[in-house]
Amino acid sequence: MTEISASQVKELRDMTGAPMMDAKRALVEAGGDLEKAAQLLREKGLAAAAKRAGRSVTEGRVIARIENTHGAIVAVGSETEPVSKNDEFLGFAEKVIDAVEKQGPDAIDSLEDERVDLVARIGENIEVVGASRFEAHDGEVLASYVHPPAQKIGVLVRAQGSPDLARLVAMHIAFANPRFVTREEVPEDEIAVERDILEKLPDLEGKPDDVKAKMIEGRLAKGFFADSVLTDQPWIHNPDQTVGQALAEHGAEVRDFVRYALAG
């Protein structure tokens, strides 16, 4: 059997980040050839990542960052809470937000090899669950909110108005989880399904058509729209008004938002 020195093991570990015994076994299998041993570790890492792919990643970290006129938000998932606090995991998550902030969501493809290697070293699935980047145009502001202490829910908002109000909106979105900014964004077929459900409720039977239509619209507003549409939701900072009313009061408007949540 080829004699493997401690310095060879250290060099391979420095190259690959592999655990000591894995590095030593790879060197033995490769007959002491560092490059071949590194390739063996890489192949084993790919196999390990493929085996773990698809495992649920309900822990992890959401990170948001704003730099001048652009901002980014990413959600990097792990299987367990301890890994979400692991220095290697956190270092990888920082690389993801750096890449997305500078180059956009497609930049995460350049980190795939590193992700695979990390999966092999840590021993559980790690995935970039979501990545988005916004550019603020004339008169627009960006704001973000990541909910402490777990940092598993985060929001990035692009709006017209003050940064302070935009941040309050981001906090609202984190808690209320709307899917659309305004009613105009809701697909017509989705509204039609909701109307159909309401029309079949027993308490509407026998009502005149105009009364029935009014009741359906009222229930849509208080139910479906208040749940799904940001501007229709009760403002968490003052439930006596809707988000839309709060925005109008300040001459503000939400242009876009993204919300990521790691459920667990």
Name every feature range the model reports, one short phrase each.
Residues 2-264:
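N-terminal assembly/interaction segments in proteins that build large macromolecular machines
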